[in-house]
From Swiss-Prot:
In plastids the minimal PEP RNA polymerase catalytic core is composed of four subunits: alpha, beta, beta', and beta''. When a (nuclear-encoded) sigma factor is associated with the core the holoenzyme is formed, which can initiate transcription. This is DNA-directed RNA polymerase subunit beta'. Mg(2+) binds at D492, D494, D496. Keywords: Chloroplast, DNA-directed RNA polymerase, Magnesium, Metal-binding, Nucleotidyltransferase, Plastid, Transcription, Transferase, Zinc. SUPFAM superfamilies: beta and beta-prime subunits of DNA dependent RNA-polymerase. The lineage of its organism: Eukaryota, Viridiplantae, Streptophyta, Embryophyta, Tracheophyta. Belongs to the RNA polymerase beta' chain family. RpoC1 subfamily. Zn(2+) binds at C69, C71, C87, C90. It is found in: Plastid, Chloroplast. It catalyses: RNA(n) + a ribonucleoside 5'-triphosphate = RNA(n+1) + diphosphate. One of its GO terms (molecular function) is zinc ion binding.
Length: 687
């Protein structure tokens, strides 16, 4: 519906029989009223056309093809505002076939039927209003032995049961003696005067309720129970507490019905709405076989049983009352199965032992109508996959699997193939994409270079839950992500999934580049703290990367249990020499040796370092001093080494480190230099 502010909205609730009739009934130009479905048939087996007054009737729901009636006549639909014309022979209007998506029908039930959601769902709204046990109400509705029960009619005329209520004593067997009269002659007159059974009794009692009186009486009782002192009996006190909770729920329910202008008797159905045909289709599959929605079969079951009950009530006056009650029970069960199959019981199955999919199954759950097609629609140009860590990625890049990328950018690839005259039409281009020719990957790379993508992880609780990235192709089926951006998404690499979206318009791409790229969202929008900080895996990696030489040369020299060579073998104290650890002139040589697998990531090494006044001015005493024949000597400290000439001048300085330390230092140095260049560039622009 559309409210006064032109906001589209959907409201779910109870409606009156008059409203159901207004939705489903329509008046043809010849003043004929149609809308009631009376036949349980769908299509004629010979003509393959919808049966008249059946579940797919074109008179009720509209034509299957726009402007074509059931006779095959055709009329041009010029203006929908004009009065629609119809075929006088078959009674089908010449309107658009899309009317079959929203035009409803109805089934006029031969007996009232309780809505199973309001009777059997817990808490039961009907039991709450009537303040009666649910088992007693079920016995009244379904007439099941031995839980069979009946109610007094609401009529004010004197009855035997009303007179019986004046006596002080009770006959315990009266409840079981009444069913003996079901097969006696004249039972109908007795039943109509003395007792009321089935959903009709529920409807009478609900219609006789005054909601404001219920609120007043419930509040008075709740207040009275609240003023009573505890009895000391745990069972009695708990019973009083449950009664008070029940009264609160009853008052809230009555207030809700008053606020929404809903009458309690609407929970008992007299007219059963029939869904539009397009929402419960019959589809022809390969081999000429028909595949139908389960709801059609459930509707057919309701119509069959309802027509049988109608015949029993109208044509056969001598029908036993017990047979009528059994048929009413069958109608009630058929409607229950249609609305919610298997609620608090065994579900109904077809001939292949498959459970029928009822109306509740269609709308509820993750794959239901609301969550799949209304609330969480599937979006074009989008995909979903598991995320894994991409340690070699830049902060603003993400790895997109080839299988996902070729589907998301398929239209762009087709355009590229046609522009480069590699395909004559769309069909040829799609065949090349299916065959995954080498030129496809080249064009895909060109397309992805200038096209950002959006990654989203549900739930999106703040604006950093969706960020833009520059995609690159990767092997496998998982999306590769830089670990620093995980905190903004509140994601980790334990099986989390992310959705991929392709911004199509120029405005969306501009917004993604200028506002949503991950390297532009380094601070939390809420408190301003850095949000791209190392966590979890990165902290462990940094620890392993820098854990090689924490204890210095002293530990390696005087504690042989802590010294191991590259083959993970313990070095004997007598054979250990610092000269056995490799020397490198610069960091590039050390990294090259690591890439050639001559040293490990945590293997200690000596790296030539620039002269540092902090090292020279240090008062630390050397661990050892080694003299050479030319007069030079080596001063060995815990973490560094100084080579001096005969004049005690410093020639070289070496620091004891690992390849992991070198990697970390280079990254930090490059980051500082980049930040410095950015600051200097900003100052230049401001000048």
């Amino acid at each position: 519906m559309i409210d006064q502010y032109k906001h589209q909205q959907l409201r779910i609730g109870l409606v009156s029989p008059k409203q159901i009739s207004a939705w489903a009934t329509k008046i043809l130009p010849n003043r004929e009223i149609v809308g009631e479905v009376t036949k349980p048939y769908t299509f004629h087996y010979k003509t393959n056309k919808p049966e008249k007054d059946g579940l797919f009737c074109e008179r009720i729901f509209g034509p299957i093809k726009s402007g074509i009636c059931a006779c095959g006549n055709y009329r041009v639909i010029r203006n929908e505002k004009e009065d629609p014309k119809f075929c006088e022979q078959c009674g089908v209007e010449f309107v658009d076939s899309r009317i079959r998506r929203y035009q409803m029908g109805y089934i006029k039930l031969a007996c009232p039927v309780t809505h199973v959601w309001y009777l059997k769902r817990l808490p039961s709204y009907i039991a709450n209003f009537l303040d009666k046990p649910l088992k007693e109400l079920e016995g009244l509705v379904y007439c099941d032995y031995p839980n069979f029960s009946f109610a007094r009619p609401i009529a004010k005329k004197p009855t035997f049961l009303r007179l019986r209520g004046l006596f002080e004593y009770e006959i315990q067997s009266w409840k079981y003696s009444i069913p003996l009269f079901f097969t006696t002659q004249g039972f109908d007159a007795f039943r109509n005067r003395e007792i009321s059974t089935g959903a009709g009794a529920i409807r009478e009692q609900l219609a006789d309720l005054d909601l404001r009186t219920i609120i007043d009486y419930s509040f008075a009782e709740w207040k009275e129970l609240g003023e009573e002192d505890p009895t000391g009996n745990e069972w009695e006190d708990r019973k009083v507490g449950r009664r008070k909770d029940f009264l609160v729920r009853r008052m809230e329910l009555a207030k809700h019905f008053i606020r929404t202008n809903i009458e309690p008797e609407w929970m008992v159905l007299c007219l059963l709405p029939v869904l539009p045909p397009e929402l419960r289709p019959i589809i022809q599959i390969d081999g000429g076989k028909l595949m139908s929605s389960d709801i059609n079969e459930l509707y057919r079951r309701v119509i069959y049983r309802n027509n049988t009950l109608t015949d029993l009530l109208t044509t056969s006056r001598s029908t036993p009352g017990e047979l009528v009650m059994c048929q009413e029970k069958l109608v009630q069960e058929a409607v229950d199965t249609l609305l919610d199959n298997g609620i608090r019981g065994q579900p109904m199955r077809d001939g292949h032992n498959k459970v029928y999919k009822s109306f509740s199954d269609v709308i509820e759950g993750k794959e239901g109508r609301f969550r799949e097609t209304l609330l969480g629609k599937r979006v074009d140009y989008s995909g979903r996959s598991v995320i894994v860590v991409g340690p070699s990625l830049s902060l603003h890049r993400c790895g997109l699997p080839r299988e996902i990328a070729i589907e998301l950018f398929q239209t762009f690839i087709i355009r590229g193939l046609i522009r480069q005259h590699l395909a004559s039409n769309i069909g040829v281009a799609k065949s090349k994409i299916r065959e995954k020719e080498p030129i496809i990957w080249k064009i895909l790379q060109e397309v992805m270079q200038g096209h950002p993508i959006l990654l989203n992880r549900a739930p999106t609780l703040h604006r950093l839950g969706i960020q833009a990235f520059q995609p690159i192709l990767v092997e496998g089926r998982a999306i590769c992500l830089h670990p620093l951006v995980c905190k903004g998404f509140n994601a980790d690499f334990d099986g989390d999934q992310m959705a991929v979206h392709v911004p199509l318009s120029l405005e969306a791409q501009t917004e993604a580049r200028l506002l949503m790229f991950s390297h532009m969202n380094l601070l939390s929008p809420a408190i301003g703290d850095p949000i791209s900080v190392p966590t979890q895996d990165m902290l462990i990696g940094l620890y392993i990367l820098t854990s090689g030489t924490r204890r210095g040369i002293c530990a390696n020299r005087y504690n042989p249990w802590n010294r191991k060579n590259d083959q993970n073998e313990r070095i004997d104290d007598k054979n250990y020499k610092y000269m056995e650890e490799p020397f490198f002139c610069n960091s590039y040589d050390a990294i090259g040796a690591y890439c050639q697998k001559r040293i490990n990531l945590d293997s200690p090494l000596w790296l030539r370092w620039r002269l540092d006044q902090r090292i020279i001015a240090s008062r630390e005493a050397p661990v050892e001093v080694h003299y050479e024949s030319l007069g030079t000597y080596h001063e060995i400290y815990a973490h560094y080494l100084i080579i001096r000439n005969i004049k005690k001048e410093i020639i070289f300085v070496y620091i004891r480190t690992t390849v992991g330390h070198i990697y970390l230092y280079r990254e930090i140095e490059e980051a500082i230099q980049g930040f410095s260049r950015a600051c200097s560039y900003g100052k230049t622009v401001l000048k």
